[in-house]
Amino acid sequence: MHTVWKGSISFGLVNVPVKMHAATETHEFHFNYLHKDCHNRIRYIKKCPHCEVEVAAENIIKGYEYEKDHYVIMEEEDLASLEAPLSRSIDILDFIDLSDIDPIYYQKSYYLSPEEAAHKAYKLLCQAMSDTGKVAIAKLTMRSKQHLACLRIIDQSIMVLETMYYPAEIRHLEASWDNVSPTDTEIAMARQLIENLAAPFAPEKYRDELREQVKELIEKKVSGETYRVAAAPEPGKVVDLMEALRASIAMTDQKKQQNTAESETEEKPTKSTLTPRGRRKVKGA
């Protein structure tokens, strides 16, 4: 697995050298922009509007606009000097309960694996965190940014690091609908609908259906097949809330009964009988 960062986990006087690997990947289709007339790729030119010239990469520097059209120049050495003391350490600040973290704070997941000489220290930290049921809040510098992070243990022996947003980066939404109160009957029916739809989390049953359709469309176009563009669905009509709840509950009740019947059928032992010719015949075959 590709290593994206190397450093060490630091807590107290203990240091555990680790490597970081991306835990997720996207399966999006990446399209190129082409010139409609000749189908050649569009080129994006970095041009200075003042000098009216194309600017090469080695002549591009960083600047921060502190007021309109006024910049303070930031040299790479300036930024590197700030990062140097922090760049190779995951500093644990606190150990907390995972349930205390609102998922809105999570950004991206990474695996942490131990360096060859740190297997025992890594396993020790994993075991201690598993036994106490705690996760760690830490800070690290990666890609010119200091990240807040959560370290947690999965399968008792693998450490996952989740980068997190700082509180100042979380937007807040005011609930302008607090003056509306559903009736007790509506709440009871909504709860029943939720109970009907409740199920264990099985991630393998969820699919990116749009991606599958895009893949199929690309394959058809590459092979020269014709295709039909499906009509856009009609916008949903506003219906009575109680009627919608009743209909939804009835639909989920029917589906639950059907699933139960299918499960019972699968669990029944298959009975066999002897035919006049001595062959075994399976009932229902």
Curated annotation (Swiss-Prot):
UniProt entry keywords in alphabetical sequence: DNA damage, DNA recombination, DNA repair, DNA-binding
Residue ranges of the region described as Disordered: 250-285
Sequence ranges assigned to domain Ku in this UniProt record: 9-176
GO BP, sorted A to Z: DNA recombination; double-strand break repair via nonhomologous end joining
Domain of life: Bacteria
InterPro entries per UniProt: Ku70/Ku80_beta-barrel_dom, Prok_Ku, SPOC-like_C_dom_sf
An annotated Gene Ontology molecular function: double-stranded DNA binding
A Pfam family annotated for this UniProt entry: Ku
CDD domains, per database record: KU_like
Subunit (UniProt): Homodimer. Interacts with LigD.
Family: Belongs to the prokaryotic Ku family.
Described purpose of this protein according to its UniProt entry: With LigD forms a non-homologous end joining (NHEJ) DNA repair enzyme, which repairs dsDNA breaks with reduced fidelity. Binds linear dsDNA with 5'- and 3'- overhangs but not closed circular dsDNA nor ssDNA. Recruits and stimulates the ligase activity of LigD.
Record-given protein name: Non-homologous end joining protein Ku
Lineage, broadest ranks: Bacteria, Bacillati, Bacillota, Clostridia, Eubacteriales
